[in-house]
Amino acid sequence: MILTNHSLIGVALTHKSIQYSIIFLIALGSHYLFDMIPHWHYRTPSIKEAVNAPFGKRTLRVSSAPYDEIMRIILDLTVGLGLSLYFFSASPMVIVVGVAGAVLPDLLVGFGRFYPIRVLVLHDRFHKWIHARHMLDDWPLIGITSQIIIAAILVFLLR
């Protein structure tokens, strides 16, 4: 699922709460729950591997400049935050905490590409394990439409 959808779903489920820890944990859990549903992703293929370098630094091998992918992720995150602020009347802090919890798992996967430390590798394995086995990446019309429908239903029902 794209970050916009995870943001909207996480905030839809938590915007009426005032306990930041509860908001964060429910939004975090929603990420894993909704990743079980077949969905579409945009690709981020340019980062191939991280290798050890002198003095413990990581050196990335990339197939192309990853700036387009990074900008796509930033735009996706910004749209999700903006739509969450638009649709829900909760305090901005509640919305930011909900968005943060909802998108953290995908951001951890991304950080794991840069810094493949044990905790991030274990998280990546768990994230892949819990993920839907059937992906809609090759059917963007179906995948994107299904994500819009899921987010719209939750926004409408929980607003």
Name the predicted role of every residue range.
Residues M1-R159:
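N-terminal membrane-targeting hydrophobic helices
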